């Protein structure tokens, strides 16, 4: 999967660990995962286990 920046990772991608996984399904994150970015990326969701 493609990594994405969770809100808990910090304000920007520079120098921060990207702990989320970009999820492209319109229904949201898979079972047992949660959306870790409040406003969401441009496409899909940023999900974390």
UniProtKB/Swiss-Prot annotation:
UniProt keyword annotation of Secreted present: yes
GO molecular function, one term: sodium channel regulator activity
Taxonomic superkingdom: Eukaryota
Protein family: Belongs to the sea anemone sodium channel inhibitory toxin family. Type I subfamily.
UniProt keyword Secreted, yes or no: yes
GO biological process, one term: regulation of signal transduction
SUPFAM superfamilies in the record: Defensin-like (SSF57392)
Compartment(s) where it occurs, according to its Swiss-Prot or TrEMBL record: Secreted; Nematocyst
Protein name (record): Delta-actitoxin-Axm1a
InterPro entries, per database record: Anenome_toxin (IPR000693), Myo_ane_neurotoxin_sf (IPR023355)
Record Gene3D superfamilies: Anthopleurin-A
Organism of this sequence: Anthopleura xanthogrammica
SS bond partners: 4-46, 6-36, 29-47
Job of this protein: Binds specifically to voltage-gated sodium channels (Nav) (site 3), thereby delaying their inactivation. This toxin retains the greatest capacity to discriminate between the cardiac (Nav1.5/SCN5A) and neuronal sodium channels (2.5 nM versus 120 nM, when electrophysiologically tested and 14 nM versus 400 nM, when tested by ion flux), whereas its paralog Anthopleurin-B has the highest affinity of all anemone toxins for the mammalian sodium channel. Its ability to differentiate between cardiac and skeletal channels appears to be associated with domain 4 of the channel.
Keyword field: Cardiotoxin, Disulfide bond, Ion channel impairing toxin, Nematocyst, Neurotoxin, Secreted, Toxin, Voltage-gated sodium channel impairing toxin
Annotated positions for site Key residue for high affinity and preferential inhibition of sodium cardiac channels versus neuronal channels: 12, 49
GO-annotated cellular components: extracellular region; nematocyst
């Amino acid at each position: 999967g493609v990594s994405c920046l969770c809100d808990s990772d910090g304000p920007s991608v520079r120098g921060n660990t990207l702990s989320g996984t970009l999820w492209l399904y319109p229904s949201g994150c898979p079972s047992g995962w949660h959306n870790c970015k409040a406003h969401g990326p441009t496409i899909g969701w940023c999900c974390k286990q």
